[in-house]
Amino acid sequence: MVRILSQTKWATINPLKSSQPLGGALAFLGVGGAIPLFHGSQGCTSFALVLLVRHFKEAIPLQTTAMDDVAIVLGGAGHLEQAILNLKIRAKPKLIGICTTALVETRGEDLAGDLASIKLERAEELTGTDVVLANTPDFDGAMEEGWAKAVTAMIKAITRIGEQERQSRTIAILPGWNLTIADIEQLRDIVESFGLKPIILPDLSGSLDGIVPDDRWVPTTYGGISVEEIRELGTAAQCIAIGEHMRGPAEEMKTLTGVPYVLFQSLTGLNAVDRFVSLLSSISGRPAPAKVRRRRAQLQDALLDGHFHSAGKKIAIAAEPDQLYQLATFFICLGAEIVAAVTTKGASKILHKVPVEIIQVGDLGDLESLATHADLLVTHSHGQHASARLGTPLMRVGFPVFDQLGSQHKLTILYHGTRDLIFEVSNIFQSHSLAPTHRGT
């Protein structure tokens, strides 16, 4: 049985987690013509914006209600209304996704009531723009929770309620926050190879994939799932959720539309992908295409090649719960040993399935103290300081990755993604073991 140890320190040393509103904003960025709006101070928005820009290396349309000291005392409804109207006039978005911050949540404002009043009084001016509220206070949860809350909020506010005529070849996919742009593109490719039509919420592969739209500046996201597609999610024959944190959105969709769902806690590793391919084959009535079978064979060969480099290695991982499970099970399949596991929150049910004895809720300072005998650190770019002090190589995963290019175009799921992860890990071990030692002059 896994023991989950709570954080007992009075201060965070080298933070591991990113905030809930940042996760919520990232989910809203997966909708075409959207603008995420932080309801809080300018500083909250600026910090999140810097992290997003450094990670994606793209312009991010993130806005703020710019709460000041007067609004904190008198209430922020006026700032919220003005921000929504300004965005409608200047950017004409299809969706404004509001993410609350600790500032307004701590004050205890009736945010849902404020927004309902604004929508009622300004209905004519807001025609053509959906406004969605996700309660994402910084003081609770992390990116994982913020992403899930934003997806749930979009389903509740936009998706048409009630059972509808099902499209037998349409599948709704709810990807977890830890899937990269390349992962989502690969998901779409494999689903379409079975003759099925995927509707992916959120779809970052259409909005943050690194293209310049028609050589012009766009004030909103320039791609992603459309608001109309979100509205018609109830026509899907099946919903597939990826990651335990996406169970809530999938349950909400089932409650509102009756669409059944299947949850995959990870799509990394041979067995998990085999189950996914089997489900697609069952839904479509078709066998796995030749190119999918070939990718599976490539993964089998990679497992044989990579296990010589990874077997017996000691791995230290710091990540949010679902990504921790994804990576830990991946390394165990390679014959490695997880000697340190650190995560952001201890409430997720997936933590009890992570193949370790102890999980520490904490920060990268905890990872560093637990990883003194590790052969590899696995976390985001802020782990570089621990890596340098310990002299242990770092495999960069998750968010943010700001000291390498192309992190969002790295595959981590399905047959190809698992294969590529094996190669990456094996190459890290090889290059580190062959690194030149210091020679005195």
UniProtKB/Swiss-Prot annotation:
Entries under CDD domains matching the protein: Nitrogenase_NifN_1
Organism lineage string: Bacteria, Pseudomonadati, Pseudomonadota, Alphaproteobacteria, Hyphomicrobiales
PANTHER family in UniProt: LIGHT-INDEPENDENT PROTOCHLOROPHYLLIDE REDUCTASE SUBUNIT B
Family: Belongs to the NifD/NifK/NifE/NifN family.
Pfam families linked to this entry: Oxidored_nitro
Xref: InterPro entries: ChlB/BchB/BchZ (IPR050152), Nase/OxRdtase_comp1 (IPR000510), Nase_comp1_CS (IPR000318), Nase_Mo-Fe_CF (IPR005975)
NCBIfam families xrefs: nifN
Pathway stated in the Swiss-Prot or TrEMBL entry: Cofactor biosynthesis; Fe-Mo cofactor biosynthesis
Protein name: Nitrogenase iron-molybdenum cofactor biosynthesis protein NifN
Domain of life: Bacteria
Role description: This protein may play a role in the biosynthesis of the prosthetic group of nitrogenase (FeMo cofactor).
Entry's Gene Ontology BP terms: nitrogen fixation; protein-containing complex assembly
GO MF annotation terms: metal ion binding; nitrogenase activity
Residues holding [7Fe-Mo-9S-C-homocitryl] cluster: 44
Keywords (A to Z) from UniProt: Metal-binding, Nitrogen fixation, Plasmid
